[in-house]
Amino acid sequence: MTGLSKDIAQPTSGAPMVKAEGVHKSFGLAHILKGIDLVVNPREVFCLIGPSGSGKSTFLRCINHLEKISAGRLYVDGDLVGYRQKGDKLYELKEKEVAAQRRDIGMVFQRFNLFPHMTALENVMEAPVQVKGETKAVARERAERLLDRVGLGDRKGHYPAQLSGGQQQRVAIARALAMQPKLMLFDEPTSALDPELVGEVLDVMRDLAEDGMTMIVVTHEMGFAREVGDSLVFMDDGLVVESGHPRDVLTNPQHDRTKSFLSKVL
């Protein structure tokens, strides 16, 4: 799979693709994110690792305002996510404005969340037609091209139940790309797959990286992080514990918590 660059929206502001400043998130009394500061640059593959419950997936969901942050600021391509600032005050955006921001952000979940009553092709066409108002002809042409790119051109008429888990996840990636996002968020995209199916999904993500897609990837696939990642953050207990180039962090961790975690997964 190559040649996806025409389906990748380019950043427009000259700002970092993602910037988090003191991001906190609480659910009731549970303090999940405890002051996250990080920067993701355009075209970067940014990997988040850490134990379950460390806040990785919650942070990912905050980036596109599926979860509202409790304090701090989150920016995507220079735009404040979910809010408008006037003076010192923040005003929450209307749902229509939030939806417009989300159009630039593709998200791929652990579970594929495909519409079971739609074919692979229809799943990929749905959002461009319903959300962006594209004609079916335009949406179909892009959907067919994207399914070809993820190696499923011969499965476009299949329903999700007729596809393997790896094939369903590749359809989900094509569906996210159909909106021509400038940023892709991957929340443990291989964790629900049988081991023999993991490689085909990682191959698609590797090709996306080569085509210049900015990606934030929550993953337990340390080999992928080492080979493809540009930056890596280890999170634990809602905090960024350690960050750096993946090879440096994975081969020479500096923090005891990072060392303990990696000793169990490598």
Which residues make up each language-model segment?
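C-terminal boundary and immediately downstream tail of ABC-type ATPase nucleotide-binding domains
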Residues: 2-4, 234-237, 243, 247-266
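Short, low-complexity, intrinsically disordered N-terminal peptides in bacterial proteins
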Residues: 1-13
